[in-house]
């Protein structure tokens, strides 16, 4: 990604629609490489013994500070990125890419976002190798999984082009 992007206000609803399958049992994640987006989801996965290769968090839940997730990440390599609400900053995109590269070399990595991590679901779908699973939280619904494949990437890229403008 070459530019910082801003979410178009009239596309916010479309971007927040469920993009995968609601997780009824964490067993579906067995033997999968996981990239998690969100503090609660990451904490739930770690608490159940499923360690995401990459975790993207902002140390908040429902916009309230909650630093407890950080205590689960003691053996993760930590990267920090700025990503204000309603944006997709190039810096954050590149940190997600770096975290994936680190994980492919055998070390788990976390991106701690100064701002908001929600929209980093886009690089979490577009950047990992096929076969990974991106897991995120859908408020009022639960955890959602997106299998990373060509179709998921194309849908994410199309929505990215439709819903964002360079800033």
Curated annotation (Swiss-Prot):
Protein name: GTP-dependent dephospho-CoA kinase
Lineage of producing organism: Archaea, Thermoproteota, Candidatus Korarchaeia, Candidatus Korarchaeales, Candidatus Korarchaeaceae
Pathway note: Cofactor biosynthesis; coenzyme A biosynthesis
Functional note: Catalyzes the GTP-dependent phosphorylation of the 3'-hydroxyl group of dephosphocoenzyme A to form coenzyme A (CoA).
InterPro entries tied to this protein: GTP-dep_dephospho-CoA_kin (IPR007164)
HAMAP family: Dephospho_CoA_kinase_GTP_dep
Reactions listed under catalytic activity: 3'-dephospho-CoA + GTP = GDP + CoA + H(+)
Protein keywords: Coenzyme A biosynthesis, GTP-binding, Kinase, Nucleotide-binding, Transferase
Organism expressing this protein natively: Korarchaeum cryptofilum (strain OPF8)
Family that this chain belongs to: Belongs to the GTP-dependent DPCK family.
């Amino acid at each position: 990604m070459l530019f910082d992007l801003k979410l178009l206000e009239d596309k916010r609803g479309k971007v927040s629609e469920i993009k995968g399958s609601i997780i009824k049992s964490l067993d579906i994640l067995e033997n999968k490489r996981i990239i998690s987006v969100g503090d609660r989801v990451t904490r739930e996965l770690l608490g159940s013994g499923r360690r995401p290769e990459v975790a993207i968090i902002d140390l908040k839940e429902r916009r309230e500070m909650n630093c407890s997730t950080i205590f689960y990440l003691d053996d993760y390599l930590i990267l920090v990125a700025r990503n204000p609400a309603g944006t997709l900053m190039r810096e954050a995109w590149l940190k997600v890419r770096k975290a994936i590269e680190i994980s492919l070399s055998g070390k788990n990595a976390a991106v701690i976002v100064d701002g908001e991590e929600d929209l980093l679901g886009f690089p979490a779908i577009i950047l990992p190798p096929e076969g990974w699973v991106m897991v995120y939280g859908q408020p009022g619904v639960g955890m959602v999984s997106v299998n990373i494949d060509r179709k998921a990437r194309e849908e994410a890229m199309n929505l990215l082009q439709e819903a964002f403008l360079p800033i």
